[in-house]
């Protein structure tokens, strides 16, 4: 039994390595990092503009800012927060042409994410008009669902805080797992819904779990390194936030793509088991 498990694990790692080489995930993460830096302002503008139209999402907006501070760039959250506030204020004085151009940039980022993840599954790209319709729906309805999720999270926090006042420690322990569970759920939905092919949700959940673990541990390790070895501030000075942010976005996308690749490889393992695919054929594509 142990020998069978080890054989399957070796095969899994071999397939994963081949697919990693084929899809050039490191380069893909770099391309997404560049696109993210260009599109982060439009995305922030759209999200908080929609939040401002719904007074019920005021607390959710504050929660989202906290989430961005904690995850967008560990150890540089305060600076990023100031930039976000400035972006939102400046967007209110923009012309219609400027707003349309920023929205176009945001749509292009969503398009690149879609193409990159579909390349991992070697699935065909969707029709352009159909794709843009989906992207626009995500861009407009996405913030509403984000606001609802953060509003629910705020409600849970209030309940748990009440339990804490009563001396019930379970609530505080549950609260510490909420960010991880939200990250896991988000990655699971991305791996299930974005590929233009059928994806087994169990495989997506496994890939998302690995990505969420890497993301969470990476965030803590990155923040610890920046706090313990602050030499980057001496080198870059006032510009230190930029390389920190670029590096963390690069790592974040790499974790997400690794989880997506693992999900796809689990599907390959099923095909190998059924005899519809073999490791030799996978290696030939790598060469």
Swiss-Prot record:
It comes from the Bacteria. One of its GO terms (cellular component) is plasma membrane. Keywords: Cell inner membrane, Cell membrane, Membrane, Transmembrane, Transmembrane helix. It is a multi-pass membrane protein. It is found in: Cell inner membrane. The chain crosses the membrane at residues 37-57, 93-113, 128-148, 174-194, 204-224, 238-258. It holds the Pfam family Virul_fac_BrkB. Belongs to the UPF0761 family. This is UPF0761 membrane protein MS0032. It comes from Mannheimia succiniciproducens (strain KCTC 0769BP / MBEL55E).
């Amino acid at each position: 039994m142990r020998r069978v498990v080890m054989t399957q694990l070796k095969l899994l790692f071999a397939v994963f390595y081949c697919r990693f080489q084929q899809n050039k995930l490191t380069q893909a993460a770099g391309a997404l990092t560049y696109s993210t830096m260009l599109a982060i302002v439009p995305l922030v503008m759209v999200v908080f503009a929609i939040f401002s139209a719904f007074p019920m999402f005021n607390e959710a907006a504050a929660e989202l800012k906290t989430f961005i501070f904690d995850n967008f760039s560990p150890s540089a959250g305060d600076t990023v927060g100031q930039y976000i506030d400035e972006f939102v204020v400046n967007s209110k004085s923009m012309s219609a042409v400027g707003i349309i151009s920023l929205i176009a940039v945001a749509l292009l980022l969503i398009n690149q994410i879609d193409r990159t993840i579909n390349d991992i599954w070697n699935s065909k790209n969707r029709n352009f008009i159909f794709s843009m319709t989906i992207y626009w729906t995500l861009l407009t309805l996405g913030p509403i669902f984000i606001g609802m999720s953060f509003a629910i999270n705020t409600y849970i926090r209030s309940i748990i805080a009440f339990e804490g006042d009563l001396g019930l420690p379970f609530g505080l322990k549950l609260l510490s797992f909420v960010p991880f569970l939200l990250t896991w759920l988000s990655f699971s939905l991305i791996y299930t819904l974005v590929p233009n092919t059928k994806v087994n949700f169990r495989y997506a959940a496994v890939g998302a779990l690995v990505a969420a673990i890497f993301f969470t541990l990476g965030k803590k390790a990155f923040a610890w390194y920046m706090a313990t070895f602050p030499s980057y501030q001496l080198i870059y000075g006032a510009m230190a936030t930029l390389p920190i942010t670029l590096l963390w976005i690069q790592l974040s996308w790499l974790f997400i793509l690794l989880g997506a690749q693992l999900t796809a490889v689990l599907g390959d393992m099923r095909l190998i088991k059924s005899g519809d695919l073999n490791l030799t054929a996978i290696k030939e594509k790598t060469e």
